[in-house]
Every structure is written in C-alpha cells, then in structure tokens.
C-alpha cells in the first residue's frame, strides 16, 4: 500500500480547525496508508492517535508570530520530513471538501498538484502586482502567471521534498537582504511553480472551509494581533 504523509500546521486559534479537518480526511484517497503530521503549539492529545484508519502524530513547534509561521512553512515540513510515497499539505483552516479516489481524480500523481487561489482562478498576474512586494525578492515573477493558493499542495515525495528544499533556500537568500515578499510562502511557492512548470499540475481542488462565526472571528483576531506584533520586528 502506498503511504501518504499529510502535513498540517495549526498554531494559536487555528488549532480549532482540526475538529473539522479530521471529519473527512479518511475519504482523501482511501487507497493510501495515511499519516497526518501535525505541527502545532498544542494538540498533544492527538499524538499517536488512530481514527478512521488515519494515524496522527504531533510535533511541538513554537507559536511564532505571523508571518514567521508561514514564511518558514516549507522549512518546517523539510525539518519534520517522513519518508513516504506521496506528501501533502493542508492549512490549519482548510479541509478535504469531497471524496477523492486514486482511480477517479484529476490529479497527476507524477507531479506537484496545487490549487488556484479562490480569488484569482481566472486572472493572470505579473511580477508588478500584489503577489510580490518588490523585485528585490527572489520570489519576484516577471511574467504572466495564475496565482496559486499556498494553503494546499500534493505530490510525489521527491518533488515535494525538492520544492521544500528550494523554497527554504529562497527564504534564506531573501532574509540575508532583509526582504520578505508580501505573501511569504505563497509567493515562493508561485515562483517555484513558474520555474518548474514541467513538474506542476495546477488544478483547483480545494476551498477554504467555513467554520462557525465564533471560530472565524477568533482566527481573524489572532491574525490581526500577529500582524501588529510583527510590525515591531519587520518594517
């Protein structure tokens, strides 16, 4: 049986998303042996738990303020890497929105599968738009492209691992210049996909999961608080 490792980063109030995420994840390619690797500042009670045939592992990480947690997303995945046939990532505020079957899906299992951003699925951007803060960033893209959502990706382990390593190097290169692109991991993911078009199958598979009003407000408040904190460190 092929092994799929799903990386799931959830700190602060994003930890609430796990209750929704775990409802359907067993329907996500049921032909695979699935392990969910949770990177969190909590959720320790889920370490070594098995539910609906899915194994959960928890690795404790510091609650870094926004945008650090997203900026180093690929680095975290690289650092907590587990050998597998396929690797996947879900944001803490997302979940699988339907059943997926290996023999009946529009996935390319030899490439990195990404998702169009929900607000830009039919729009082409270039390097001068909001996707990158300036051409000082390694993530700057100077050609038309469709903007990819950073909250999800899936692919064979060798390609996902290559992407995480490459993006980590991009982040390090920018930080040496005190540069952070506007959309952090998303900007670097888009740049990697532009540079590696032959390794990418871009389809729109997932959407943001709508939580209850209380949860949505709590998540938004956390993001805004982290934005204010971050401004003290990054001008």
Place the predicted regions along the sequence by residue:
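Short acidic (Asp/Glu) patches
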Residues: 69-78, 129-142
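Short, hydrophobic beta-strand segments that form beta-sheet elements in well-ordered domains
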Residues: 34-41, 88, 113-114, 199-200
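Catalytic core and acceptor-binding pocket of nucleotide-sugar-dependent glycosyltransferases
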Residues: 138-228
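N-terminal anchoring/stem segment of glycosyltransferases
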Residues: 1-72, 79-83, 224-226, 231-232
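Conserved glycosyltransferase catalytic-site signature
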Residues: 70, 74, 93-94, 182-187
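Short loop/helix-cap segments at secondary-structure boundaries that form the rim of catalytic
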Residues: 44-54, 102-108, 211-213
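GT-A fold catalytic core of metal-dependent nucleotide-sugar glycosyltransferases
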Residues: 73-124
């Amino acid at each position: 049986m092929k092994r799929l490792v799903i990386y799931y980063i959830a700190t602060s109030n994003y930890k609430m998303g796990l209750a929704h995420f775990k409802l359907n994840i067993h329907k996500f390619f049921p032909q695979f042996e699935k392990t969910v690797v949770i990177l969190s500042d909590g959720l320790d009670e889920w370490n070594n738990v098995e539910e609906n045939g899915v194994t959960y592992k928890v690795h404790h990480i510091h609650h870094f303020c926004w945008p650090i947690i997203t900026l180093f997303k690929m680095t975290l995945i690289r650092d907590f890497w587990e050998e597998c046939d396929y690797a996947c990532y879900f944001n803490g505020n997302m979940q699988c929105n339907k059943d997926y079957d290996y023999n009946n899906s529009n996935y390319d299992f030899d490439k990195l599968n990404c998702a169009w951003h929900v607000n830009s699925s039919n729009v082409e951007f270039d390097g001068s738009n909001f996707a990158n803060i300036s051409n000082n960033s390694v993530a700057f893209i100077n050609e038309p492209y469709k903007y990819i959502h950073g909250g999800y990706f899936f692919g064979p382990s060798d390609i996902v691992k290559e992407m995480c390593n490459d993006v980590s190097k991009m982040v390090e290169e920018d930080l040496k210049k005190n540069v952070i692109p506007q959309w952090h991991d998303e900007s670097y993911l888009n740049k990697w996909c532009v540079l590696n078009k032959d390794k990418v199958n871009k389809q729109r598979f997932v959407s943001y999961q709508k939580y209850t009003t209380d949860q949505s407000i709590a998540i938004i408040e956390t993001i805004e608080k982290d934005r204010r904190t971050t401004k003290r460190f990054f001008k």
